[in-house]
Amino acid sequence: MLKESTKQIIRDSLGPLKQPVKIVLFTSDTGCDICPDAILTARAMKAASAKIALETYDIAMDRDKSDEYGVKRVPTFAVQAQDGRMIKFSGTLEGVSLLLLLDTVHSIAGVRPWFPEKILSTLKMLSQKIPVQVLLENDCTLCKPVAETAVGLALTNKHVSTEVIVADDYPELLSTLKVKILPFTVFGKQLTLEGHVSESSFLEMLFKADRQKAAGLDVRCVVCGQPSPELVCTSCKTKIQAEAVEHKRKDEKLSDRGSAMGSHNHG
C-alpha cells in the first residue's frame, strides 16, 4: 500500500507540471514482490498531473518493449522526453530515488541541469553511447548528488545513458558487482567507482569507458588538449570543480533568499 505521505510528495511535485512527460513502467506478475507498489506509485503520478502519459508493460510478455527500452530488471520506471532522452529508475521508489525521479520529470519538462561549459563541450567528443548505473540506498543523502550528476549528464548528452538502481532490491546484482560501499557507480561494462564522484571524475570515467584514449605516446587531456598522463588534466579538474562549486553556492543563496522572502510574506 502506498503511503499517504508519498502520494502527497508526488502531488506537490507534479501538480504544477506544464509540459508533457512520458513514464513507462515495466513490471512482472511473477517473482516481483515490490511490483504492486510500483504500479500504485505510477498511478499516483498519473493522477497528480494530466501532463503525465503513463504506459505499463510486462518485462516478459512485452519483450519487444523491454528490449526497446533496454530494461533488465523489474520494477523499472523509464522517464522519457519527446526528443527521446530517457532516464531509468529501478527498484522501490521512495526517499532519495523518488525525489530523483520527480526532479528528472521536471528537468525533462523544462530547464535542463547545469554543468560547467568545459564538461558540456568535451562530452560532444564521445563516440558511442556509454551506459552509467548508480546504485544507491533510499535513505542515503550522500548518494543523491552522485545520481544527480549521472542523470544530468544523460539529459544533456545523447551518448550518456543513466539508470538509477535501488541497491537493496537487487541482491544478486550487488553480489555480481561486489558492491561494498554506496553509492556505487558503473561506467560502461567494467569501470566502477565507490562513494562520491565529482563532475570531473565522471567526465574522465566516461572517456575511459569510451576507449578514446589508448595507452602510449601523445596522451592528451580531453578538455584542453594539452599533454597529460590522465584523461582530464589536474588543471582542468580544478577549474571544473571550482566552477561547479561556485554555481552551487549561487543556487543556495537564491534558495535561501526565496525562503526568506516567503517567510516574510506569510509572517
Residue ranges, per PLM feature:
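Short functional micro-motifs and their immediate structural scaffolds
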Residues: 227-229, 241
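Short cysteine-rich clusters marking metal-coordination/redox-active sites
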Residues: 140, 218-224, 233-236
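Short Cys/His-rich micro-motifs in 6-15 aa windows
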Residues: 235-248
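N-terminal leader/targeting and pre-domain segments
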Residues: 1-22, 96-128
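Local sequence-structure signature of Cys/Sec-based thiol-disulfide redox active-site neighborhoods
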Residues: 6, 10-49, 123-158
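Thiol-based oxidoreductase modules, predominantly thioredoxin-like and allied folds used
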Residues: 50-64, 158-172
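Non-catalytic, surface beta->alpha helical segment in thiol-disulfide oxidoreductase systems
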Residues: 78-113, 181, 186-215
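Thiol/disulfide oxidoreductase modules built on the thioredoxin-like
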Residues: 66-73, 173-182, 191-197
